Structures are given as structure tokens and as C-alpha cells.
Amino acid sequence: MSAPKKVVLAYSGGLDTSIILKWLQTEYGCEVVTFTADLGQGEELEPARKKAELLGIKPENIFIEDIREEFVRDFVFPMFRANAVYEGLYLLGTSIARPLISKRLVEIAEATGADAVSHGATGKGNDQVRFELSAYALNPDIKVIAPWREWDLTSRTKLLEFAEANQIPIAKDKRGEAPFSVDANLLHTSSEGKVLEDPAEMAPDYVYQRTVNPEDAPNEPEFIEITFEKGDAVAINGEAMSPATILTKLNEYGRKHGIGRLDFVENRFVGMKSRGIYEAPGGDILLEAHRGIEQITLDSGAGHLKDSIMPRYAELIYNGFWYSPEREMLQALIDESQKHVTGTVRVKLYKGSAKTVGRWSEHSLYSEAHVTFEEDAGAYDQKDAQGFIQLNALRLKLLAARNRRVK
């Protein structure tokens, strides 16, 4: 690969990407364009601009964009229509953000005449795969620079030494130490590294940044109502809101009640196991509510088929294949299933849990007349069950007879 002349860097303003910025300038001698995305991580982003300028980036080469609405509307909500969770637990908060960041990197590269993009993902993790598969899916000719796979800064200690030698400020956590490896957006916050690398050690409470300890949450439950239209949340307690505003509001409820904490050892796409602390307060509430409205609006056959493809759909997102044809095919099926997923769900929030306690819809398939234990006025003839059972039992009876005959 020929040396790039201009590179667009996914830049957070944090330690790793600031070091990468400096490294690109010195190692490649190239012009650097920075892209900083506001995905709802809750940080003031202007310091990233000032830090980039301090490191020699021209003002016209600094891109800071609020893409929260696009993130939730076009990435988070489609994923939640699928009830997607990786390995039964993880809400894919980091995974789902990477395709959008890659999309903007490629678009900015094309707009500024850059011939390469760069990211701060390590050579051990999943993010390198997600960034690069997404970039190549959108522009097959783009060059990608992954410093962690090239440089000799092979540990966090060497990284800190490089930062000190180049006068790059090093952030500290609230205990005065170098912070955990943290990723955050509107959907979640993840923390990895340091004491968390020992899966036997209980995560200290100070690791959790987004939620109160459930034991310290209010002693009284709170009830909220979430309204859905075609599988997407559109209102809370009757108040219509934009996608990003809905997730922001649900995060506030979840934070208050200690909802959405996960201590998880996952199987990375690259082959190793990794332990992380995840917090998705609004995501947990949204998933519970979406499942609640599907319970009365989704046909059983459609629902069971949808459940069967969910693990594959979640795996595709986790592994970085958002822009793959198979993900898009599954998305079309999932979206078709959501045509009647419209209605309202009441959710109880209490000390770390979000539980559906009521649901109603004009599109409901629930028939009280059929299911009642009381007189059903002829809605259902219980004698019909006899033939249903006999037909479904036929193959089992034939198998039993064969097994009795042939030992």
C-alpha cells in the first residue's frame, strides 16, 4: 500500500486517538483530518476540537457532528425491532455504533479528498473488524490505517510513555488513575481493562458510570408507558418524542432505578474471550417494552421464526457485517414482522429491573373471549381439541409402536 497523503481519523479526543493523531503525523508525514461523532456519550466535544488544534490540525480539517438522531433512528431502532442480543445478554451497544462512524469516515474522506481512514481499535478486539468491514463495504478502494497493528506501542504503559514524551495530556479517572478502556454512546457504556481483566474479581462499584447501584435505587417502583408504532418507540407517557429523545429519557429512568447493568464474558470474533462491564439503562427498558408489545400483536408463527433468526442477526452486527446482504435480508424480514407491532406497554421500574405489567393495542391478537376460564359464549369449542391432539399424536404413536416392536 502506497503511503497516504491525507487520512481521516476517527478521533475521540481521548488518549489513544490523540497518540494516533501524533503518530500518523510523524510516521506517515501525512495531513490528518479528524472526525468526532456525538453519539450521546455525554461528553463535551469542544475539548476534542481544541486538542486537535493543539496537535496541529487545521480548523477546516476538524469535523465534529451531532449524529444522535441518525444513530438511534437508522441503527439502534432497526436492531431493537429484532430484539437483538449477542450470546443472550449483550445489547450490542458498541457494535451498532461502528457502522455509522465508518459511514461518516468514508463520506468525509470523499468530501475532503482523503485517500485513507484510520481508527483507534486494537489488534486484539472486534472494533478493528467492524470499522474496516464497514469501510470496505461502502468504498472498496479506501485505504485503512490501523496503528495498533503497525506500531511498537504494544502496551498501555508504552502508550503513556509516548504521550508524556510528546506532551499529550493524560486524563485521570475520579480516583486519580489512568481510566479504564471506555466506550460510550446513547445506548450504552462499556468498561474494560485493569482489574476487570480477572474474571474472578467482582467489579468495583466505581466502574459503573451510568447507573446507580440497584441497592441504592428508590424504594418505591415507578411506572411508565411506552407507545410503539410499527416496532419503534414513538412516545413516553403519551408525549411524542424523537428517537434520540426517547432513548435519552429512558436512560434517565434507567439510571435512577439502577437498570441495565451487565458483567459479561463474551466470545470475541477474533477468537478470545473478553470481560466487560456494560450499562444500557434505556436499552434494557426499551427491549422489555418491545417484547411486551410483540406478545399481543405478533402472530405466533411469525414470532417464533423471528426468534429463531435473532441470534444470527445479532452475530452479524457483533462481527461487523451491518452492511452485508445477509443482514439486510434479515432486516427486511424483521421489518415485515413489525407492521402491526403498534400499541402501548406499561413497564414497572424497580431496583435494577424493568418488567412489563400491562400492554394494549388496536392491533392485538389477544382474545379474552377465547382464553377465559369463564363462560366463553361459544367462542371456542373444547371438543375440537380432541381431533387436534389425535392428529398431532399420530407420529408419536407410530414411533412408540415401532420401538416396542423393534428392540
From Swiss-Prot:
One of its GO terms (cellular component) is cytoplasm. It holds the Pfam family Arginosuc_syn_C. Keywords: Amino-acid biosynthesis, Arginine biosynthesis, ATP-binding, Cytoplasm, Ligase, Nucleotide-binding. The keyword Hydrolase does not apply. InterPro entries: Arginosuc_syn_C (IPR048268), Arginosuc_syn_N (IPR048267), Arginosuc_synth (IPR001518), Arginosuc_synth_CS (IPR018223), Arginosuc_synth_type_1_subfam (IPR023434), AS_cat/multimer_dom_body (IPR024074), Rossmann-like_a/b/a_fold (IPR014729). L-aspartate binds at T122, N126, D127. Its main location: cytoplasm. L-citrulline binds at Y90, S95, N126, R130, S181, S190, E266, Y278. Its EC number is 6.3.4.5. Coiled coil: none annotated. The keyword Kinase does not apply. It catalyses: L-citrulline + L-aspartate + ATP = 2-(N(omega)-L-arginino)succinate + AMP + diphosphate + H(+). SUPFAM superfamilies: Adenine nucleotide alpha hydrolases-like, Argininosuccinate synthetase, C-terminal domain. CDD domains: ASS. Belongs to the argininosuccinate synthase family. Type 1 subfamily. This is Argininosuccinate synthase.
